[in-house]
Amino acid sequence: LIQNSRARVRRETIVADVRVRAPSVDVRTVGAGGGSIAFVPELTKALRVGPESAGAVPGPACYKKGGEQPTVCDANVVLGYLPSDVQLGGKMEINRDASVMAIQTLADAMGIDLMAAAEGVIKIVNESMFGALRLVSVEQGYDPRDFALVGFGGAGPLHANALGVLTDAWPVIIPPGPGVLCAYGDATTQVQDEAARTYLTMASDLTDAQLAEDL
């Protein structure tokens, strides 16, 4: 969350079971991306998405790199959100037939039609992303309606409008080159160093001169 041109920072981060006591930008991750695998458990017959991912290799079925499991990317292709008549990066072709075959396995498992299955995948992943947005806004005391929503990353713009509707955030902004926005920021942002140390003393003994001398 960015307010007054400054990103929110937290002093410690928990990675798995490790508490990292170092300042970092307050980022909340969610196991939902273009490569997240959708599946229907035999026991519940309820559609689920992620956290397992097909990654870049073998990737979604539409990449034709060996991946056959249905992913969020394949659902976007089936629904036409990701056109199959364009080349990713000017080189990679999208195979819609492969996406249809992958998503059809979900439809057959749930006894619904192809489009309904694809829509179900997208609705689930949008709700997962919405939950992450709530963590950095509503649960921190901020109203998302007071902010614009920026969609970036490889698949972010595909879901940005739906998330704008869910959060009532306006406007929804898609920056130029959304797939490389993080890399661009990493290359151009100013480096900031911080240092801290513990200083123990009695308040009655503390003076400006003593503090300057000790530190």
Which residues does each predicted region cover?
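N-terminally biased helix-coil "hinge/interface" segments that flank
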Residues: 1-215
